[in-house]
Amino acid sequence: MNRANRVVRGIWLFGFIACLASNAASNEAVAERPNVIVVMTDDQGYPELSVHGNPVLQTPHLDSLHDESLRLTDYHVAPMCTPTRGQLLTGIDAARNGAINVSSGRALLRPEIPTIANYFGDAGYATGVFGKWHLGANYPFRPQDRGFQESVWYPSSSIPSVPSYWGNDYFDDVYIHNGTEEQFSGY
């Protein structure tokens, strides 16, 4: 097993252990359980945050999250968005989880593999995903089929700057909210 696979499995194992620990502590008040929020940006590198020393880009809200949160500092991404997302959600390398590309049917997680949302949901957490999904737009690949109780997502790899099939162009776009197309207002 190469180093990258060990790192991905370590991240997944950490999340799984956190779920088990929170489940074991279910006698404690729910308010004492930690909130778990995973922020994954698309096509943003490590040096593109002001907290990491970028002299041009100012990212005060992300810097605040950085300062107040647990950070996974040794997670290695794939050269494309879909394999990276699949690895984070399953803890399994893209070559084994099925999401190895961004097109041609190779952007689908194997349905028998549970996601981190399944484990957190089983531990009593509310789960949600918001934003780009690009891991399948039909059953059994949609967020609501993969353990997410709440979802607002876009069923493609990007929102183009010219209107798409849905008329999306970053303003007043149509997203899929818990399985139903819904018009949203704003940017």
Give the location of each predicted region.
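Bacterial N-terminal signal peptides that target proteins for export
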Residues: 1-12
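Formylglycine-dependent sulfatase
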Residues: 24-187
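Bacterial N-terminal signal peptides
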Residues: 10-21
